[in-house]
Amino acid sequence: MPVIKCDSIYKIFGHNAQKIFQSTDGAIDTDALQQAGCVVGVNNASFEVHKGDLLVVMGLSGSGKSTLLRCISRLTEATAGKIYIDGEDLLALSEKKLIELRRNKMGMVFQSFALLPHKTVLENIAFPLQVKGASTQDSINRAMEMVLLVGLNGRENNFPR
């Protein structure tokens, strides 16, 4: 079972985007959308991510990468499509369940992220777990697992440059 499954995700920005999209039967007519003042942010994205996979979303500036990720986290609502996290229909979750899922199963690293310069690599990785209430030892142990997973062993005591 995939950890993340996206099936035919569309995001169209603009007035009456949902209504205009439904009238196209999924066949995006860019001219009609432009005439209606709409912009396509994500056009029929479908993929699966399985445990242990690494997925890279690449594209030019403005091509919809961040919009797709915002749809997956439901920070932006998709115009159409289905999104599943661990088999759970993300679009059917209550606000409370969505908050719980965001806290425990997903996170975003922003393009202009900042490391805490007074903390080591290991401490920077452990910090969010401590904020969530994990003990120092548990968070350090989990952070060390991540250090090993991404090949930073031997650098865990370094400070950011």
Residue ranges and their predicted role:
Residues 23-31, 88-89, 130-133, 137-155:
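Conserved ABC ATPase "signature" region
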Residues 32-36, 90-107, 136:
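ABC ATPase NBD coupling module
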Residues 58-60:
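The feature captures the beta-strand-to-loop junction immediately N-terminal to the Walker
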Residues 73:
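Helix-to-loop junction immediately C-terminal to a conserved catalytic motif
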Residues 79-89:
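ABC nucleotide-binding domain "signature motif"
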Residues 93-96, 141, 157-159:
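Interfacial catalytic loop of ABC nucleotide-binding domains
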Residues 118-126, 159:
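Short coil-to-helix segment of the ABC ATPase nucleotide-binding domain corresponding to the Q-loop/switch region
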